[in-house]
Amino acid sequence: MDFYSNLDSRSLDSETPTLFEIISAQELEKLLTPSIRYILVHYTQRYPRYLLKVANHFDELNLAIRGFIEFRQLSHWNSTFIDKFYGLKKVRNHQTISTERLQSQVPTLLEQRRRLSKTQIAVSLFEIVGVPYLRDKLDHLYDKLYPKLMMNNLDPKESLKTFVQYYFLKLYPILLSVLTTIQVLLQVLYLSGTFKSPSIIMWLFKMKYARLNSYDYTLDEQRVNKFLNKTSPGKLGTGNNRIRPITLTESLYLLYSDLTRPLKKGLLITGGTLFPASIFLLKFLEWWNSSDFATKMNKPRNPFSDSELPPPINLSKDLLADRKIKKLLKKSQSNDGTCPLCHKQITNPAVIETGYVFCYTCIFKHLTSSELDEETGGRCPITGRRLLGCRINKTTGEWTVDGIRRLMM
């Protein structure tokens, strides 16, 4: 699945992955459990009868299922599900062996010696599945007990239970800070090339990251062929010394192998395409939730924020011939600081879309006047242009006015 990675392996080191690849894989790893939980909760609300018990025991089920999947990946590829997507694997860290020289001379022997041991596989499985599970449980316990500590309801001298809870609340944040500091320090040393292990557990158990190569894919092809040919019909009746015909049991065995072989191929094809597609979906959801594009798409449209405004609609010739309109137009041409509506000095100035300034109370009363109909109302009293922020409720006949902006003088 490393072919689905967005990294060009030709421009990178053929042996040691970069820290940014490792961090990217770890960030994607953290998205798996919350994404599955979100999908499960969504469908639990629709079908609570069938999924409520599953949702209540999600942590344990996720631990078991993901543990099985990751164990298979670590046993076959020495890589986790996400690391394989990025073309990464874990190998033994032989500090006394020159891997570059052996890689060019005896690559197969080197790859065999670098395969993870059973202990290292178990430790890697615990790091991927067990550590996040314990972290979630401890965080939940800390959030549950912390209010008791703030209310002084935990007396360490009362009982052994309260003693453990009290010092857990005191030491747990310190322990997390120390582990985080060590983790960051190891990553900095890995970035500088001093250390080959970017995490505490990998450093303690002498493991490091490497890239998947032709040896891993050849080994996988051998496993696939063995899996498909496990019940191959060619194994029956091919001997030269065989005289008797095929028995009923052997006929059923051949029928079973003919039926299961397409199913096995379909299972392999589905696993090879469905899982990478789900990872691409997770990456898309991560981008969607973190980008401004999603915010703009979910934001309701504002009629005043459109870049292309509709052209203004002027009053008809009959309305423009009105003496009152002509008087307002003539009055607005004077720049004496008076309101065109009340003809007094402007108080509490407000501007409308056409740029003319009025008293706030005057322009608001004018635009909300019930005497104006849909044709004459909702317009600038000076230019006669229709205002976008004025809308009439045809049921009640009342005007809704937006777009009046007060001026700070």
UniProtKB/Swiss-Prot annotation:
Disulfide bonds: none annotated. The keyword Zinc-finger applies. Pathway: Protein modification; protein ubiquitination. SMART domains: RING. Residues 1-18, 76-117, 193-273 are peroxisomal matrix. GO terms for molecular function: ubiquitin-protein transferase activity; zinc ion binding. It is a multi-pass membrane protein. One of its GO terms (biological process) is protein import into peroxisome matrix, receptor recycling. InterPro entries: PEX12, Pex_N, Znf_RING, Znf_RING/FYVE/PHD. Pfam families: Pex2_Pex12. The chain crosses the membrane at residues 19-46, 51-75, 118-152, 156-192, 274-301. CDD domains: mRING_PEX12. A zinc finger (RING-type) spans 339-384. Keywords: Membrane, Metal-binding, Peroxisome, Protein transport, Transmembrane, Transmembrane helix, Transport, Ubl conjugation pathway, Zinc, Zinc-finger. PANTHER family: PEROXISOME ASSEMBLY PROTEIN 12 (PTHR12888:SF0), PEROXISOME ASSEMBLY PROTEIN 12 PEROXIN-12 (PTHR12888). The three subunits of the retrotranslocation channel (PEX2, PEX10 and PEX12) coassemble in the membrane into a channel with an open 10 Angstrom pore. The RING-type zinc-fingers that catalyze PEX5 or PEX20 receptor ubiquitination are positioned above the pore on the cytosolic side of the complex. Component of the PEX2-PEX10-PEX12 retrotranslocation channel, composed of PEX2, PEX10 and PEX12. Belongs to the pex2/pex10/pex12 family. This is Peroxisome assembly protein 12. It comes from Komagataella pastoris. The gene is PEX12.
